[in-house]
Swiss-Prot record:
This is Minor capsid protein L2. Interacts with major capsid protein L1. Interacts with E2; this interaction inhibits E2 transcriptional activity but not the DNA replication function E2. Interacts with host GADD45GIP1. Interacts with host HSPA8; this interaction is required for L2 nuclear translocation. Interacts with host importins KPNB2 and KPNB3. Forms a complex with importin alpha2-beta1 heterodimers via interaction with the importin alpha2 adapter. Interacts with host DYNLT1; this interaction is essential for virus intracellular transport during entry. The lineage of its organism: Viruses, Monodnaviria, Shotokuvirae, Cossaviricota, Papovaviricetes. GO terms for biological process: microtubule-dependent intracellular transport of viral material towards nucleus; symbiont entry into host cell; viral penetration into host nucleus. Belongs to the papillomaviridae L2 protein family. It comes from Human papillomavirus type 50. A motif (Nuclear localization signal) lies at residues 1-8, 498-503. The gene is L2. Minor protein of the capsid that localizes along the inner surface of the virion, within the central cavities beneath the L1 pentamers. Plays a role in capsid stabilization through interaction with the major capsid protein L1. Once the virion enters the host cell, L2 escorts the genomic DNA into the nucleus by promoting escape from the endosomal compartments and traffic through the host Golgi network.
């Protein structure tokens, strides 16, 4: 007989969803309040108010005390509305007492005890005191101390039908303070200050109430204490720095102890040299890479099918190695550290969770700096005086007045005589394309009178004269100008232009 298996309850399904199981949308939305009805209540709840109609998502029992029908009250003790009576006295508002200014000319009589004094020993009808006049009783009210406050408040009670009743309770006014003065008692107190009798009271100051006339007796004696600046402090360095550019020791030790030397980080010393050059070879088997950069963080991804043991047992299950950190220890060694993470637990989503391990390797000791004592090379027992005649000469250099020095113009005259005998005169003549257009006449050993015109400056060399003019042969070739026109008077049809082929080179 086949029986249908009962489906799990919505509560069990939602608990399974929270633990990572399958989440059914309708069950999840019901428990998290994301159904359509919940959305409508959230949207229209701010627009429409149904507070007095009892509409809600509760059990429908009317709250903790149930529903109360409209109209006449139900069974039970009938309720009676009590009138609210207004208190007869003025109720002071709660809060701090008002600040009353103090008059400096007022009497400074402050009672020593709180409350009313005991005046039972002196009755008003007892008659005058023995051996004195009548006793007068005064009531003193001080505005600075007699500040009214709330002495009590109304007592509020409630009955079974939750009706509030207010009981009229009036606070008791505070009793006025009374002081008894007896004119027969006259006590005089004298104070004698004599520094010769009592040398310890040289700096006694007598202060009198400012409402009466008084004098200040005594001098101000004080001790002169030299003040020193607190920001300038001298201290001695206990040990010399071990680095050329040392940083603050406090920040370095605090950051190192917080990150690497925490109680939640395991400490693992390493002695393999590959930890400095290529630490990935200690985690997984691989070849030596000459282009490996050791100053980076390393992430290792492993497949469960190809899981292998690490080359070094200390690096088993390591999935992350941080960048190297160089520091110095208290023993004076240089330490290279890397912060790693082991994959101790892997969830179904692929998240790896594991402890952190501090891998470190101590390289070498930092030798202390040798202090070399410097000796004096030469010690002169007495003062020596050296006199030099060259240093005794004083020379003044005045560059400002050196421009006005008089010079002789004969210094500018050239003493070398130039001779142009057996000279060769070459006259080059070329066009714009550097082609020779005019024949060069070679005038060798021909005395000529050559004139050179250069603008407004004309120089004539009269050392050479033409002896025989028949030596100059004139050319019979007629000289005609040559015009070169470089332009075209037509346009070629585009169809006659050769087609350009595109050749792609790979």
């Amino acid at each position: 007989m086949l029986r249908r298996r009962k489906r799990a309850s919505p509560t069990d399904l939602y608990r399974s969803c929270l633990q990572g199981g399958d989440c059914i949308p309708d069950v999840q939305n019901k428990f998290e309040g994301n159904t359509i009805a919940d959305w409508l209540l959230k949207i229209f709840g701010g627009l429409v108010y149904f507070g007095n109609l009892g509409i809600g998502t509760g059990r429908g029992t009317g709250g903790t005390f149930g529903y109360r029908p409209f109209g006449a009250p139900g069974s039970g003790r009938p309720t009676q509305e009590l009138p609210i009576a207004r208190p007869n006295v003025v109720i002071d508002p709660l809060g701090p007492a008002p600040i009353v200014p103090v008059d400096p000319s007022a009497a400074s009589i402050v009672p020593l005890v709180e409350g009313a004094p005991d005046v039972g020993f002196a009755a008003p009808d007892a008659g005058p005191a023995a051996g004195g006049t009548d006793i007068e009783l005064y009531t003193i009210t001080n505005s600075t101390t007699d500040v009214g406050a709330v002495g009590g408040g109304p007592t509020v009670t409630s009955n079974e039908e939750f009706e509030v009743a207010v009981i009229d309770a009036q606070p008791i006014a505070p009793y006025p303070k009374q002081l008894l003065y007896d004119s027969t008692i006259a006590a005089t107190f004298e104070t004698q200050i004599n520094p010769f009798i009592n040398p310890d009271i040289n700096n006694v100051n007598v202060l009198v109430d400012p409402s009466f006339a008084g004098d200040t007796v005594g001098d101000y004696f004080y001790e002169e204490i030299p003040l020193e600046r607190l920001d300038i402090q001298t201290f001695d360095i206990l040990e010399p720095p071990t680095e050329s550019t040392p940083t603050q020791l406090g920040n370095r030790f605090v950051s190192r102890a917080r990150d690497l030397y925490s109680r939640f980080v395991a400490q693992q010393p390493i002695s393999e040299p590959d930890f400095l050059s290529q630490p990935s070879r200690l985690v997984q088997f691989e070849y030596r890479n000459p282009a490996f950069d050791p100053d980076v963080s390393l992430y290792f991804e492993r497949d469960l099918e190809g899981l292998r043991a690490a080359p070094l047992q200390e690096f088993a299950d390591v999935v992350y190695l941080g960048r190297p950190r160089v520091s110095s220890t208290s023993e004076g060694t240089i330490r290279v550290s890397r912060l790693g993470t082991r994959a101790a637990l892997t969830t179904r989503s692929g998240l790896s969770v594991g402890p952190q391990v501090h891998f470190y390797m101590d390289l070498s000791d930092i030798p202390p700096e040798d202090s070399i004592e410097l000796h004096t090379l030469n010690v002169t027992p007495q003062t020596s005086t050296i006199v030099d005649d060259i240093l005794a000469t004083t020379t003044f250099d005045d560059p400002a007045n050196s421009l006005f020095t008089q010079f002789n113009e004969d210094v500018l005259t050239d003493d070398v005589e130039h001779n142009f005998t057996e000279s060769h005169l070459v006259i080059p003549a070329t066009d714009e394309e550097n082609d020779t257009a005019i024949n060069i006449i070679n005038l060798r050993n021909i005395p000529l009178t050559v004139g050179m015109n250069s603008g407004d400056i004309s120089t004539t060399l009269s050392d050479y004269n033409i002896l025989d003019a028949s030596l100059i042969v004139k050319s019979n070739v007629s000289e005609q100008p040559l015009f070169v026109l470089d332009y075209s008077d037509y346009d070629l049809h585009p169809g006659l232009l050769p087609k350009r082929r595109r050749i792609d080179y790979f």
